[in-house]
Curated annotation (Swiss-Prot):
InterPro entries to which the protein is assigned, alphabetical: Ribosomal_bS20, Ribosomal_bS20_sf
GO cellular component: cytosol; small ribosomal subunit
Similarity comment text for this entry: Belongs to the bacterial ribosomal protein bS20 family.
Coiled coil, from the record: none
Name of this protein: Small ribosomal subunit protein bS20
Chain spans, region Disordered: 1-23
GO molecular function: small ribosomal subunit rRNA binding; structural constituent of ribosome
GO-annotated biological processes: translation
Taxon lineage: Bacteria, Pseudomonadati, Pseudomonadota, Alphaproteobacteria, Hyphomicrobiales
Highest taxon of source: Bacteria
Length: 88
């Protein structure tokens, strides 16, 4: 248990940041899932629209430190490759 006032404040800040990070990570998962569902259904237009929305969300999460930059790049790359196969 935190004893000093600064430690108590730090605990509150950590809880706030954790909630923000959890929300951002959840948003990323939602956007990625929407792309994957559109790819699975074979709807090219919906998949492209979902991908355009998901890519900046992934990169924003990487910028904010929620996920690693390489992880975000890998996810974007793999989704783009699957979208390219669908388009071909």
């Amino acid at each position: 248990m935190a004893n000093t006032s600064s430690a108590k404040k730090a605990t509150r800040k950590i809880a706030r940041r954790a909630a923000i990070n959890k929300n951002r990570r959840s948003r990323v998962r939602t956007y990625v899932r929407q792309v994957e569902e559109a790819l699975a259904s074979g709807d090219k237009a919906a998949a492209q629209a979902a991908f355009k929305a998901a890519e900046p969300e992934l990169m924003r999460a990487a910028t904010k430190g929620v996920i690693h930059k390489n992880t975000a790049s890998r996810k974007v790359s793999r989704l783009a490759a699957r979208l390219k196969v669908l388009s071909a």
